[in-house]
């Protein structure tokens, strides 16, 4: 996949949506919540600071991350796969 996000942007592939609820009920498409976890597939070079230096992002390709519920409104489709473009500040945690 060839995508290179700019600055402190991160491209994430969302985790698969749950097909069933915790109680075993099959969820229709409209009842499913978009997952707020995913795998990092590309990272930008980092944030440019006021002094001109670039601070690299803290995540790397392959990391599994948790992001805010309302983050990820910027989505793109590449090769039939939906990807989310986030700012690094939208990422809440790295799952190790």
From Swiss-Prot:
Key word Cytoplasm present: yes
Keyword Lyase attributed: no
Keyword entries, A-Z: Chaperone, Cytoplasm
Pfam family, one: Cpn10
Chief place where the protein resides: cytoplasm
GO molecular function: ATP binding; metal ion binding; protein folding chaperone; protein-folding chaperone binding; unfolded protein binding
Localization per record: Cytoplasm
Any one GO cellular component localisation term in the record: cytoplasm
BP terms from Gene Ontology: chaperone cofactor-dependent protein refolding
Known function: Together with the chaperonin GroEL, plays an essential role in assisting protein folding. The GroEL-GroES system forms a nano-cage that allows encapsulation of the non-native substrate proteins and provides a physical environment optimized to promote and accelerate protein folding. GroES binds to the apical surface of the GroEL ring, thereby capping the opening of the GroEL channel.
Family membership noted in the UniProt record: Belongs to the GroES chaperonin family.
Protein name: Co-chaperonin GroES
